[in-house]
Structure formats: C-alpha cells, structure tokens
C-alpha cells in the first residue's frame, strides 16, 4: 500500500445519472444510472478537464474508451461525464470484474501487485489473450506518455459478454503527474520491480516482447499508432479547457516521455 499519497479517483466524487435528452441535462439518480458524473475534487485542480482531454487523446490513438465529455455545472465549474459500459438496455448489466477483485485485493492493497501480474491474468482468464495483450501494451505506453502513474489494479477490468472474456474499454485515464505535481513514481504497478526511470528497453523489449510475447511487427504497429496520434495530441492539449499553465505542464511531461521512448 502506498502511504505517501492517495489515489485521485479514490477521493474524486462520483455521481450516478441518467441523460434527459428532451431537457438537455443529466438527472442524478440513486439507481439505474447510465452515466457517471465526476465533479472536481476539492483537493486537486482541473481534474475534469484533464480526464476529458486524456480520454480523448486515448481515443485518437485507437484505445477503446466509453463515450465521455465535459459539462458545465450550475456553479459554472466543469464536470466530467462518462457513459457506463456495463449497462445495456433499460436495466441490463454486463458482468465486470476489476483486477483487484480478481486477485482478492482491496482499495488498500490495489497497488500491491505488478504489471507482470496483470499480463498473467490476461493470459489465464481472457478467451483470446493474443488479442488482449496488444491492448494492454498500448495502454501501458499511453499511460506512460501521458503521465498517468496511478493505473493500479482497480483501473484494469475484464468483462464477460456472450461467453467471451476480454478487457473492458479503458477508463480513469488522466495525467496524474500533472495533478499531483512532482510525482515520485511513473507507474502505480512495478515493471520488473521498477516504478520510476522507465526506459524504452524496459517497456518494449522486456514487457511487450518478453513478458507479453508480442513480435516486432505488433510492437511497431502500436508505436506507429502512437506516433501518428502525437501531432493531434499536441493540438488537443492546446485546445483543451486546461489553464495555460496546465497546458504547458502537460506538454512538457508528454514531450519528455516521447523523447524517452524515442517516439515520432
């Protein structure tokens, strides 16, 4: 367990809501919500705009994400919203388990694992692990590039649909390094025992190739998607609802990680 700081999503308020199209608004509900609304947590700054931006950047890179966006609250503050991917029809549900549940961990022990363990669970539990492993590799690289050092076990999930077990769409993606300031780590879960000073060799040769078993063409395909997305990311950051200072800080984090991965 990490005692030095709290998980951002762990302290971020989450509200259940349904969309009232005719009223062009969300209505808060106790049950049956199809959307989650996330106002800005008091302890941090610009989290909704940060998450909306980062999720959009993920989508541009080909990472599957739920429908999401920003809305203005009555007090003129930003609220992030995201559609629940585990709800279907009027009252249907898709069975979902996060990786913390899969290994019997809890909110206090969600950091007590490793990315190797995540890969192992995908290999053991997914119906088609060869399809899911490149997804995991891409998410790892994306989170590294966008300063997300808070991807713990509860931020990875499997869903069970039509007899097939696979990774859910990505969620809770944000630049946590930007929110928390000078982060001590670069990954919530260790990679070959390391949580900081991650390198291209560690991410690609060790994790993607050795641990996930991806071949060179698969790795190159992932890197190409990220490289193609890079100029669009820069535009998205510049056009985002972050403050000028936050835009500059986000860009600085991104460019340093891009250089380290030798991307683009």
Give residue spans per PLM region.
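Conserved ATP-binding subdomain of kinase catalytic cores across diverse folds
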Residues: 1-112, 159
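Conserved kinase catalytic-core segment
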Residues: 43-59, 114-179
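Regulatory N- and C-terminal appendages and interdomain linkers associated
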Residues: 124, 164-165, 232-264
């Amino acid at each position: 367990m990490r005692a030095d700081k709290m998980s951002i999503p762990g302290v971020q308020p989450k509200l259940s809501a349904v969309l009232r199209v005719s009223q062009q608004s969300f209505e808060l509900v106790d049950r049956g919500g199809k959307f989650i609304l996330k106002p800005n947590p008091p302890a941090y700054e610009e989290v909704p705009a940060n998450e909306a931006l980062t999720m959009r950047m993920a989508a541009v890179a080909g990472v599957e994400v739920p429908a999401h966006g920003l809305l203005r609250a009555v007090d003129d503050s930003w609220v992030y919203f995201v559609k629940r991917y585990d709800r279907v029809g009027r009252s249907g549900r898709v069975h979902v388990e996060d990786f913390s549940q899969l290994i019997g961990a809890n909110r206090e022990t969600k950091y007590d694992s490793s990315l190797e363990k995540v890969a192992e669970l995908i290999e053991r539990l997914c119906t088609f692990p060869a399809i899911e492993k490149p997804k995991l590799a891409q998410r790892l690289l994306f989170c590294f590039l966008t300063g997300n050092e808070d991807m713990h076990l509860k931020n990875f999930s499997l869903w069970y649909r039509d007899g097939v077990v696979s990774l859910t769409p990505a969620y809770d993606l944000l630049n946590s390094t930007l929110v928390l300031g000078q982060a001590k780590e670069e990954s919530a879960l260790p990679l070959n025992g390391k949580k900081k000073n991650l390198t291209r060799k560690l991410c690609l040769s060790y994790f993607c190739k050795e641990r996930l078993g991806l071949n060179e063409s698969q790795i190159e395909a992932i890197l190409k998607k990220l490289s193609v997305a890079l100029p669009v990311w820069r535009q998205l950051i510049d056009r985002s609802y972050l403050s000028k200072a936050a835009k500059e800080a986000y860009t600085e984090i991104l460019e340093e990680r891009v250089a380290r991965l030798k991307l683009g």
